[in-house]
């Protein structure tokens, strides 16, 4: 914990010293109004759930109905801070609907993505960043939740896919069907290549018991590891999970997939994680959040 706090202090000092002048040149001001901070495993957890609305008579689907449903079904986890509870999909009368509010329905469902962060870690991070930037608007979010949502913005035409988000301690697996998250699973990341593939295969096997698996896999990992992990998945006998001799397509997500979608300094080296954070923040701002 002491080392983590010191690392955060060094990061904050560096951003103030080097980032403020860059910001001044780019937008004419070096001040910060809000901070988005991504926190990864083992300090975060992400889950997805679906809630349903059914009435005997047709009803108008409203933001108030959604807010009431989210609040009434939300859960508290001891020693965990809920940092995100987003409605990421809406189904009216059996059809996925992008602009559902104000429309009439007989039945509806909402898909909710919820993120928790270890309370002590979140409070320490928020307190330190508020002190550095003199703003109360510090928003922590679970890293894999952010990246899952950013991938949807980066590849809007891939409506069915698996997303593998690999960090040093774990691999999160998200299943997207018809542009909706329907399942999230967690596999331990192991140093041994065979163990990592085995753990991922085990989680995919469990998901396949409930849903058909899409043929596209997006692989998110550090640039130094992504090529090796892509080869491991390519060499694994995954076809049996798809009941096919043809293996699924494994797409290693690279900075080049995202860089055209966000504005960045010409002198900066593309960093995939920062690009995905920027894309996420940009999309949320466009949605008025």
Spans of features found by a protein language model:
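Nucleotide/phosphate-binding catalytic cleft detector across ATP-hydrolyzing
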Residues: 1-34, 39-161, 210, 235-240, ...
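Short glycine-rich, Thr/Ser-proximal phosphate-binding strand/loop in the N-terminal lobe
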Residues: 1-2, 51-60, 179-196
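Conserved structured catalytic cores and adjacent interaction surfaces
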Residues: 158-159, 181, 215-217, 266-268
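Glycine-rich phosphate-binding loops at beta-strand->alpha-helix junctions
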Residues: 213-241
């Amino acid at each position: 914990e002491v080392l983590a706090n010191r690392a955060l202090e060094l990061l904050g000092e560096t951003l103030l010293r080097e980032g403020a002048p860059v910001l001044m040149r780019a937008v004419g001001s070096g001040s910060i109004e809000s901070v988005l901070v991504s926190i990864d495993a083992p300090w975060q957890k992400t889950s997805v759930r679906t809630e349903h609305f059914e009435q005997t008579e047709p009803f108008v689907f409203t933001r108030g109905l959604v807010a009431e449903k989210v609040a009434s079904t939300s859960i508290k986890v001891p020693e965990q801070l809920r940092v995100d509870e987003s409605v990421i999909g809406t189904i009216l009368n059996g059809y996925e609907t992008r602009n559902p509010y104000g429309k009439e329905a007989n039945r509806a469902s909402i898909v909710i993505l919820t993120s928790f962060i270890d309370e002590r870690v979140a409070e320490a991070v928020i307190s330190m960043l508020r002190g550095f930037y003199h703003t109360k608007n510090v928003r922590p979010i679970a890293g894999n939740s952010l990246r899952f949502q950013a991938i949807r913005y980066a590849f809007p035409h891939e409506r069915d896919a698996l997303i593998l988000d690999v960090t040093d301690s774990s691999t999160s697996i998200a299943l997207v069907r018809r542009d909706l998250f329907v399942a999230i699973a967690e596999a331990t990341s192991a140093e041994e290549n065979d163990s990592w593939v085995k753990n991922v295969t085990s989680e995919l096997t469990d998901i396949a018991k409930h849903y058909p698996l899409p043929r596209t896999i997006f692989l998110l990992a550090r640039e130094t590891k992504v090529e090796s992990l892509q080869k491991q998945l390519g060499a694994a006998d995954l076809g049996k999970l798809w009941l096919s001799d043809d293996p699924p397509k494994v797409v290693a997500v690279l900075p080049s997939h995202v860089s055209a979608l966000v504005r960045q300094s010409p002198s900066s080296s593309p960093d995939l994680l920062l690009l995905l954070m920027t894309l996420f923040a940009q999309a949320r701002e466009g949605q008025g959040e």
